[in-house]
Amino acid sequence: MRNSGSSCSESVGPPLWLLAELTYRCPLQCPYCSNPLEFAREGAELSTAEWIEVFRQARELGAAQLGFSGGEPLLRQDLAELIEAGRGLGFYTNLITSGIGLDEARLARFAEAGLDHVQISFQAADEEVNNLLAGSRKAFAQKLAMARAVKAHGYPMVLNFVTHRHNIDNIERIIQLCIELEADYVELATCQFYGWAALNRAGLLPTRAQLERAERITAEYRQRLAAEGNPCKLIFVTPDYYEERPKACMGGWASVFLDITPDGTALPCHSARQLPVQFPNVREHSLRHIWYESFGFNRYRGDAWMPEPCRSCEEKERDHGGCRCQAFLLTGDADATDPVCAKSARHDLILAARRQAEEAPLGLDALTWRNQRASRLICKA
């Protein structure tokens, strides 16, 4: 891509957090995956040397944290080499994984390479539900074993549970499992509706009552853990669909976060690829050009792009106009006011989604599972 935007390098700070989406390959088929629906048409993955060059350039720009994700990053056989390269450049390194494909030997190798942090995701605290959502009969047992192994290797125990209408009522058991595993940090993250989660929203969005109950139970456990002197930290993330003001996505468009997809496409957030905006590729441009000069990264910086009521809103410095990806998904217009905002002319779309969660939700059997076959069908359509 040739740059068609204008430079705003004088007012833009450096990227601080680099996310390396090493691959879209994954042994699981979670129906709420944030990967693009059309991942089956993804081009060739960056090579080891290409990834290391990305790390070098990002570090030169000022990035300090390097996350390895996917898909499932463990499917990259060069992962230890990439960790070692990132750590050698001075990054704080973080592995975001399902734990499927991890074993004691690889964990020891990652420790030798300098990995700082491991986050393991669970689909549920119930083995049957976890395995159903993961699409693997062995997933739950493997995750438990690897969570314990991560703790034994001296890493902070960081667990992530994506919650939705089919598992959120078991929030107490989820928290109890985290305590049993001696987790240091637990992210109880209700589905954010992008990628496959957006496709399956009618079967995943909890009701307001479900959310309020889960949040209350989480708060009770926080108090109990604090009283017992237990260091476990519980982080509860609500979906935008029950808010009246939008989030400041990633702290503002292309202000802190830089995502590189498996084929080298650079994005200002995980979901931006779905937008009608052309984004640059690291195989064609330097990260410096991409971050400071490219049209895609400058498209929604600042507030000149904002329509009313955002442009004259006193809250625009706080939420930066909300999420561009969410606006596009719901309205078909990436420039539109985020419908989550009660001031939006399309807030009715959010109200309709809430009503659907109450009146006509879909069951687990109606979900579209994230896998190659489903992605190929979507690509054909």
Swiss-Prot record:
Keywords: 4Fe-4S, Iron, Iron-sulfur, Metal-binding, Oxidoreductase, PQQ biosynthesis, S-adenosyl-L-methionine. Its EC number is 1.21.98.4. It holds the Pfam family SPASM. Residues 12-228 form the Radical SAM core domain. Interacts with PqqD. The interaction is necessary for activity of PqqE. Catalyzes the cross-linking of a glutamate residue and a tyrosine residue in the PqqA protein as part of the biosynthesis of pyrroloquinoline quinone (PQQ). [4Fe-4S] cluster binds at C26, C30, C33. Belongs to the radical SAM superfamily. PqqE family. Pathway: Cofactor biosynthesis; pyrroloquinoline quinone biosynthesis. Binds 1 [4Fe-4S] cluster. The cluster is coordinated with 3 cysteines and an exchangeable S-adenosyl-L-methionine. This is PqqA peptide cyclase. GO terms for biological process: pyrroloquinoline quinone biosynthetic process. It comes from the Bacteria. It is an enzyme of class 1 (oxidoreductase). Its cofactor is [4Fe-4S] cluster. CDD domains: Radical_SAM (cd01335), SPASM_PqqE (cd21119). GO terms for molecular function: 4 iron, 4 sulfur cluster binding; cyclase activity; iron ion binding; oxidoreductase activity; S-adenosyl-L-methionine binding. It catalyses: [PQQ precursor protein] + S-adenosyl-L-methionine = E-Y cross-linked-[PQQ precursor protein] + 5'-deoxyadenosine + L-methionine + H(+).
